[in-house]
Design a protein with these regions (language model features):
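Generic recognition of short, well-ordered alpha-helical segments
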Residues: 49-52, 77-80, 147
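His/Asp/Glu-enriched, well-ordered alpha-helical/loop segment
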Residues: 5-9, 55-142
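Active-site core of metal-dependent hydrolases
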Residues: 1-72
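Conserved beta-strand positions that form and line the central face of beta-propeller blades
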Residues: 15, 124, 154
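A structural signal for short secondary-structure junctions
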Residues: 10, 30-32, 58-59, 126-130, ...
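A generic structural signal for nonpolar/aromatic side chains embedded in well-ordered alpha-helices
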Residues: 3, 30, 82, 128, ...
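Flexible loop residues that form catalytic
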Residues: 19-20, 90, 139, 172
Length: 177
């Protein structure tokens, strides 16, 4: 392809946004080069440019991530990008019986540890990784106790910056409240 001919597909050092209409040959090339495919669901929806076959790409071994593209999207908030990616994957799965929708866990991975590998050891709370984190507070609903996962799920679908009480980058508190 053109990108490869001009040396733009550096091994494990390239992120390609959108990647909606890739041929099998292009997928093979991008996979062999370790290119990260940045799925910008909100941007694609706003532009009505198409739906990335995310599940199929993942099953074919391509490295995919969830990203925001505020040039055509309307928020950089990653929780909203995760939610919309999952919703669109459900619609895509309805039209393609052989594909299943993304889960919350997969969406979270594709927005954290998955793309974090591009930058090194980030995107996870594992030992040896940079501590990049949001401290999130989600009020319990009246008398209803929820697990941490249920609270995270609520933040992904219903939370916003008012629920973030602290931000850490590489172990340093950068914003409180």
């Amino acid at each position: 392809g053109v990108y490869d001919a001009f040396g733009l597909l550096r091994q494990d050092k390239t992120i390609m946004a959108h990647a909606i209409y890739l041929s099998d040959e292009e997928k093979s090339l991008l996979g062999n080069k370790g290119v990260y495919l940045a799925h910008c669901a909100q941007s694609n929806a706003n532009l009505t440019s198409g739906i990335m076959p995310l599940r199929r790409n993942l099953e074919q071994g391509l490295t995919c991530t969830i990203a925001s593209d505020v040039a055509a999207g309307h928020t950089p908030a990653m929780n909203k990008q995760i939610a919309l990616t999952i919703e669109i994957s459900k619609l895509h799965a309805l039209q393609h019986d052989t594909e299943k929708a993304l889960t919350i866990g997969e969406g979270l991975y594709l927005a954290t540890k998955g793309p974090g590998r591009f930058y090194g050891r980030t995107g996870s709370f594992e030992t040896g990784y940079a501590f990049d984190a949001l401290v999130i507070h989600m009020d319990d609903m009246e008398g209803l106790e929820r697990t941490p996962f249920e609270k995270l799920q609520q933040f992904i679908y219903d939370g916003d910056d008012r629920n973030i009480i602290a931000r850490y980058v590489d172990g340093e508190l950068v914003v409180r409240g």
